[in-house]
């Protein structure tokens, strides 16, 4: 059995990127004329089709992925590429990730799906103590850099405390992995392809609230968006706002309302949380003198605290006000009281006003 698995999955250890028609988009490049209007889940699906098509050593697996997945992100993959490359797994997250580590260590590209980010915790040991440290503890003789773990995360309006959590901060404390969160269909496709082809393990969180809500023109060809490069979504002079994922939609609405009050807001999408783009945030804060960070996860120990600490270290004498955080509450994610838990537009707008008027 073991020998058969080795023969099936061992494909060598190199990860060629050039020569396959890939193109790297800058974070500000315009969508090509060949772009097609699609939502976020369709963009994810298209990226997975491209990943499997361009590399015969790539595999997709997880709970119900053979049927298209609960959010339909893997629709059509099993029919097109066969059940030997796209297949279902038992309901066992540590097994899904552990199997993915083994496949990646044998030179394959692995896209392992955790059905909901809330259930990634049974795989925590595999991600933190195995995937993240595999290269280091072997003295770079072995690695599982071909592993990408996809997981839908965040509020959805009716998920409650088992289907709404944002666990990104748990993984941002771990050297050896990357954490990526897209905000839109175009970003999702390019960032997912970059994550799959990156030589390091990546945890790729997908904001499920945007799966069908976010729609825009997306290039249909094979392209990648660089990891660890933040994007200034809108320029401003009075205050810098930093966020990621679905929360950026709420933050942008707050920026528009603040602009009506004469407050100029600069909005930055981190895209990659680890390693994050410190320079672009620092440059912005040195210009505006103020910083507000917003995320859905609870405020205490959230990744916003790391951003705040870093910017205070780098920009202390340029700050005009304390760094502000507008985040989820320090409570289990509630079902009925979700609107009170969430960092809403009005909460962000109030924080903008108080920070600017400090």
Swiss-Prot record:
One Gene Ontology term of the molecular function aspect: 3-methyl-2-oxobutanoate dehydrogenase (2-methylpropanoyl-transferring) activity
Protein name listed in UniProt: 2-oxoisovalerate dehydrogenase subunit beta 2, mitochondrial
Biological processes, Gene Ontology terms: branched-chain amino acid catabolic process; cellular response to sucrose starvation; response to absence of light; response to sucrose
Subunit structure: Heterotetramer of alpha and beta chains.
EC number: 1.2.4.4
Binding site for K(+): 145, 147-148, 198, 200
Domain of life according to the entry: Eukaryota
Compartment(s) where it occurs, according to its Swiss-Prot or TrEMBL record: Mitochondrion matrix
Reported induction: By dark treatment. Down-regulated by sucrose in a hexokinase dependent manner. Up-regulated by Leucine and its derivative alpha-keto acid (KIC).
One Pfam match: Transketolase_C
Transit peptide: 1-16
Task of the protein: The branched-chain alpha-keto dehydrogenase complex catalyzes the overall conversion of alpha-keto acids to acyl-CoA and CO(2). It contains multiple copies of three enzymatic components: branched-chain alpha-keto acid decarboxylase (E1), lipoamide acyltransferase (E2) and lipoamide dehydrogenase (E3). Required during sugar starvation and acts under the control of a sugar-sensing mechanism involving Ser/Thr kinases and phosphatases.
Tissue specificity remark: Expressed in the non-photosynthetic organs such as siliques, flowers and roots.
UniProt key word Protein biosynthesis: no
